Design a protein with these regions (language model features):
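Charge-dense polyanion-binding interfaces
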Residues: 4-29, 115-134, 299-311
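Conserved "right-hand" nucleotidyltransferase catalytic core of DNA-directed polymerases
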Residues: 1-75, 89-91, 101, 161, ...
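Function-dense linear segments that define catalytic or interfacial modules
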Residues: 49-136
């Protein structure tokens, strides 16, 4: 039985939590604990392969082994992350883009309400909830924000009312009303998503902000459910692909920064996880360099005059991956 289905009924029988725990333990053991040590080289490090063409959206994929899916949510998974440590005299720095897909959607669509939220520096889910529910930003409740978060992420993947109902945990009538109000509030975003679908139907592909194409052959399928899947791919590809473009520009710009500052022996990019870059840095310069690297990430679009929408990144320093 699918894990997600077992999660829904885990309180209905005392054996189900044990089944879930067993599955987690066997997964951790086979995929990480037993396997990862076999990839360690003589220098004590794992040298994975990052594949430029491993994803249709332009994101890197990682293999031998895949270091982009090291567990992060569970307590046991966090212990696996703690095994990835900085070298002697070094520390790890994580620079993580904040809500980059939604920022990409704001840039591509030009939706005034979404752009306003980011330019004001408001939490995007709080800002969304305030505008959909018609309250001030400081009056948004945690439940309102939770519902806004469900649709913010889902809408970029072609989410409909049925999926929104499940994500919000409400009756269909309430989900429909919320969906309709969201469409009204962020009308330009919704128009843009429809335009993307129409473009994909006409030309067979979509493009990112920097021009990366994603072919959508499923739109030609004789099967309706595959055509619907093709539409969801068409909607998401420009947004997720633009996010991938941005992180790759950040990789280029941070490399330039390191070279210009002559820090190539002190700062090294060691891991890329979609919207996050992980560096290994000499401990004595970590604090000052961390802020400068964040500034580099935040300027990748503005310095190229591609967009004036604020792109924000956060940073965390720590001795291992669990901490950051």
């Amino acid at each position: 039985t699918n894990v997600s289905e077992l999660e829904k009924i885990k309180d209905e029988h005392p054996s189900i939590p044990y089944i879930l725990e067993y599955r987690e333990l066997t997964k951790l053991l086979s995929t990480y604990i037993d396997t990862l040590p076999t990839y360690v080289k003589d220098d004590g490090r794992i040298h994975a392969h990052f594949v430029q063409t491993g994803s249709g959206t332009g994101r890197f994929s990682c293999e031998d082994p895949n270091l982009q899916n090291i567990p992060v949510k569970s307590e046991l998974g966090q212990k696996v992350r703690s095994a990835f440590i900085a070298g002697k005299g070094k520390t790890l720095l994580s620079c993580d883009y904040a809500q980059i897909d939604l920022r990409a959607a704001a840039i591509l669509s030009g939706d005034e309400n979404l752009v306003e939220i980011f330019k004001k520096g408001i939490d995007v889910h709080t800002g969304t909830a305030a505008r959909v529910f018609g309250v001030k930003d400081d009056k948004v409740t945690s439940d309102m924000r939770r519902k806004a978060k469900a649709i913010n992420f889902g809408i970029l993947y072609g989410m409909g009312v049925t999926s929104l109902k499940e994500g919000m945990g409400v009756e269909r009538k309430e989900a429909q009303e919320f969906y309709d109000q969201y469409k009204f509030t962020f009308s330009r975003l919704m128009e843009y998503l429809e335009e993307i679908k129409a473009y994909a139907w006409k030309y067979g592909y979509t493009t990112t902000l920097l021009g990366r194409r994603r072919e959508v052959p499923l739109l030609k399928s004789p099967l309706p459910f595959l055509r619907a899947q093709g539409e969801r791919i068409a909607i998401n590809a420009p947004v997720q692909g633009t996010s991938a473009d941005i992180i790759k520009l950040a990789m280029l710009d941070t490399a330039d920064y390191v070279n210009e500052k002559k820090l190539d022996n002190k700062v090294k990019l060691v891991l890329q996880i979609h919207d996050e870059l992980v560096f290994e840095i000499d401990e004595d310069i970590a604090e000052s360099i961390a802020d400068e690297l964040v500034a580099v990430l935040e300027q990748v679009l503005s310095k190229r005059k591609l967009s004036d929408l604020p792109i924000k990144a956060s940073r965390t320093l720590g001795a291992n991956l669990q901490i950051i």
